[in-house]
UniProtKB/Swiss-Prot annotation:
This is Alanine racemase. Its EC number is 5.1.1.1. The active site is at 37 (proton acceptor), 271 (proton acceptor). Coiled coil: none annotated. It is an enzyme of class 5 (isomerase). Catalyzes the interconversion of L-alanine and D-alanine. May also act on other amino acids. Substrate binds at residues 135, 319. The keyword Transmembrane does not apply. It catalyses: L-alanine = D-alanine. Keywords: Isomerase, Pyridoxal phosphate.
Amino acid sequence: MLKRASFVEVNTASLRHNFSAVKSIVPKDAHIMAVVKANAYGVGAIKASEIFLQEGAHYLGVATLDEALELHSHFSKTPILILGYSPNSNASMLIDNDLSAMIFSLEQAEVFSQTALKSQKRLKVHLKIDTGMHRLGLEPNFKSIEIIKKIRALKGLEVEGIFTHLSNADAKIKTHAKNQMKAFNAFLEQLSNQKIEFQYRHAYNSAGILSLCNGNENRFLNLYRPGIMLYGFYPSNGMKETCPTILKNVISLKAQIVQIRSVKKGEFIGYGEHFYTNEETLVGVLALGYADGLMRALGNRIQVAINNQLAPLIGKVCMDQCFVKLNNIQAKEGDEVILFGDKSAKANDASEIAALLNTIPYETISTLSKRLERVYI
């Protein structure tokens, strides 16, 4: 039984379909790291990980220690890589829970190694190489090769992987992404020439998987990191229009009408006098607000689906509640409202909501609060 009259509905068959789409694109012998950071982009990390592991994922990718620990408590035998920065103070917890960390400096590698040796253990690490994102990583040059040699010599570390991150593989013109891969491949060859090899070599995110697997840029890769595509979204609208791979919607934001009010003409609805009733207005109140992830800016800007009818969201979205106008809408208290989700029910999908807010669906779904229950169908 739901504890609130609002929830996130997750289509598990679509999750499986989208993972199968990844498998159909990457090389047959490739390993797949399902990226489940940010609560699996709002879907729910535990259930999503369970499904991806059932479908053949070899690795899980997250951004923070807390995310990794949550997954480790459920999937203790599954390798988990923290793709984001891990402070030195996290070293003991990384080691004790057999987690893998991203590193990009000799100084941090030395701290991690010393901590591991005190526990008579080894910490698995993946080296981050900056090929053009200019966020984190070692430069792909001779100096970094010497640093990598020193890192590999540390007794408390097991350097199991090396990777880079593509910043613009969803662009129509792939020049930058291909230049990144050219730099990464050249660096891998330089390392190999000095007998420096890695169990895992990875670079492709969803955009790379969807657009760059037909060339030879991925010839040295054996691990792939799908993220947003697992949840039914293309990395950009341009890719959605041109990509032959079919992805299925996974996530819908839903709420029930908890009260219907008749408000006379000449009144304001909600905070700040942002909606004026120029006629007698039937107002449905939903127990859903911006603290749940429904952006405040959507008030007076979108229509929501109620019993296959479209009704406007009116007034400013409150922290915990919002309003819909029900004039000429067949609805009653307790009826379900789809704020965004499956278009077969006439609702906007999250990418359309994102476009309206001049953002991306990654933000629309990953900001859905954990206080919303996830209902898996």
